[in-house]
Amino acid sequence: MTITGGPGAVPPLPPARLGCLLALIFAAILLPVARADAQSADERFTVCLACHGADGQSRIPATPSLGGQPAFFVVAQLFLFREGRRDNPAMVASAQGLTNSDLTAFADRVAKLPPPPPSEEAPDAARFTRGRRLTLSHPCGVCHNPDFSGREQMPRLANQREDYLLKAMRDYKSGARLGYGGAMSQELAGLSDQDLIDLAHYLSHFGVAPAPR
């Protein structure tokens, strides 16, 4: 496979994605040895941060920010990955072999990461307003807290990556991703794709005032 030059050349990966890929390859090669040497949870957690951001704020498209996520939620998601009940090959592979104690240790570290800050970019006023109205007409704030900070098994939504929020909601609506007792699929069933786009825009810009018209 060619990397540069000539017909059929493969374009280089963006630096962030390349770093994430190298970290996963490194982990896949060394993880069995590292486990045998009792690799610390801190060392393994560093591999996670290569993709999800050292400060808990993801800079890789469609990869969620972990900062501020409730520990209970993180344990639940890692468990689903470990058991192969969430479809993400990289995460399933990363979670293989983790003990319940490992899951708890990872979750505790994630919960200590700072939540992602509000976007520096002003939201689109129309989409922001439509998204806000949707959160008021649906029980988003009941489960995820009025400030969308998340609690227990409910994830933080505020200031999450917009592209990830949209993908997650589309997956819940289509049934590609399992929720808790089907609640998310039911709540999203009557929403259009434009509704999901507006919701993702509002939540990702939560706490940011729209630019004046």
Task: Give the label of every model feature segment.
Residues 19-30:
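Bacterial N-terminal signal peptides
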Residues 89-94, 119-124, 181-187, 212-213:
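Short, tandemly repeated low-complexity microdomains enriched for cysteine and small residues
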Residues 36-55, 118-119, 123-146, 161:
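Sequence/structural segment immediately N-terminal to covalent heme-attachment motifs in c-type
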Residues 56-88, 92-98, 132, 136, ...:
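Gly/Gly-Pro-rich "capping" loops immediately C-terminal to redox-active cysteine motifs
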Residues 96-118, 163, 187-213:
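C-terminal capping alpha-helices of c-type cytochrome domains
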Residues 1-16:
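N-terminal secretory signal peptides that target proteins for export/translocation
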